[in-house]
Amino acid sequence: MLKISLLSIIILIVSGCSTIQVTSEYNPKRDFSSLKTYAWLNDMDHPSDNLRINNELVIRSVRNAVEESLESKGFVKTTRDQADFLISWFGAIEQKVKAETITHFYAPYGYGTLYRDPAWNTQAQAVALKEYEKGSLIFDLLDPKSNTLIWRGIGQDRITEGLSGEKIKKNLHLAVSQILADFPPEIK
């Protein structure tokens, strides 16, 4: 019982320390210091064909997280015709397979290592295939006049199954804030 509890705690700690892989790219010729206002590209989002992403609760959580993050940086939400930049987003869930090599050390015939020839190799390897899901959030920021991309932020992480709605919302907020941490970029 103690082993199971300890294992559960270790798994919880490791999964809690999971970091989102964030990348961003932008137009280095763009003057980001002039950006003050923003608006959503579409009032009605259809961010994915996956029903786990394309539902009202997830869409609202992502939008709220984006707006909170941008407002904390001093950006003001406005109408499309007055915005300095527009925001669009997309989400995806991919099925992935990870191959792990497992090395087994065992003693022959149940006698333990003291009763065998030390020259006899008791090491064996096996490959375990583990399926998992990888989630991606992509934010595109566009110039409203030319409709060209000025900044893109991408966040990816392994999806943890069986989370409560509140935990999913918290993870989405964390992902959005980490992705938008690189916006506006510091151009050198």
PLM-predicted stretches and their roles:
Residues 18-30, 125-188:
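C-terminal/domain-edge helix-coil "capping" segments
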Residues 1-6:
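Bacterial N-terminal signal peptides that target proteins for export
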Residues 90-148:
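Surface-exposed short loop/turn segments
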Residues 39, 86-89, 149-152:
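Structural recognition of the beta-strand scaffold that forms the well-ordered cores
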Residues 26-46:
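Post-signal peptide N-terminal segment of mature Sec-exported envelope proteins
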Residues 13-16:
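C-terminal motif of bacterial Sec signal peptides marking the signal peptidase cleavage site
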Residues 42-98:
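N-terminal segment of the mature soluble domain
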Residues 35, 81-86, 132-137:
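Extracytoplasmic
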